[in-house]
């Protein structure tokens, strides 16, 4: 039997970066298009609000019911006051999954051309919440520049019974974020890496 989920016992890469570099400044939903103007979402995913929590973007996908979601994306974008060490990102990419007692955890570095100066990771695992089983993916993108940096966290959670039905839409969400980030970096005037 697994222990009850305790949100206070779960930490994230963002918390680790804040402890190492300094307080992060969350980018509000209204400013997301300024940072990632090409970011879109699959048509059936709807924007939602979260009571008591601040997120840059929350998308929900319902297939069979209006009473619960079958897919969820939480996207957070933060300004970072300093340089984030690569090892910190790589060592903590799966932290939220480990702290949540997920199973079948996998974590890897994503390849990004060196000219972008992006540290990118993907971690996935299976979470059990009561009688519900969900597959979770976490993508992290850290951009270091001389003027500070940015952290993008993308969490996608899909009900295990809907994995095959939503697979292409999940791929669209992750690929669109990746491409939008690189396009935004390409457009930035005289970007200098730290």
Where are these regions (language model features)?
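N-terminal targeting sequences that direct proteins away from the cytosol to non-cytosolic compartments
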Residues: 1-70, 81, 127-135, 143-194
């Amino acid at each position: 039997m697994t222990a009850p989920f305790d949100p206070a016992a779960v930490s994230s890469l963002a918390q680790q970066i804040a402890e190492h570099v300094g307080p992060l400044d969350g980018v509000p939903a209204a400013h997301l298009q300024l940072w990632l103007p090409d970011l879109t979402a699959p048509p059936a995913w709807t924007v939602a609000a979260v009571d008591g929590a601040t997120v840059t973007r929350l998308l929900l996908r319902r297939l069979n019911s209006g009473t619960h979601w079958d897919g969820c994306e939480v996207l957070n974008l933060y300004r970072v006051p300093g340089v984030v060490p690569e090892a910190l990102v790589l060592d903590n990419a799966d932290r939220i999954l480990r702290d949540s007692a997920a199973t079948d955890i996998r974590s890897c570095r994503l390849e990004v051309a060196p000219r972008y100066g992006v540290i990118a990771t993907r971690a996935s695992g299976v979470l059990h919440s009561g009688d519900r089983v969900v597959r979770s993916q976490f993508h992290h993108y850290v951009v270091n520049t001389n003027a500070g940096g940015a952290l993008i966290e993308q969490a996608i959670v899909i009900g295990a019974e809907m994995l095959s039905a939503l697979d292409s839409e999940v791929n669209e969400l992750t690929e669109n974020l990746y491409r939008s980030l690189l396009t935004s970096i390409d457009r930035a005037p005289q970007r200098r890496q730290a």
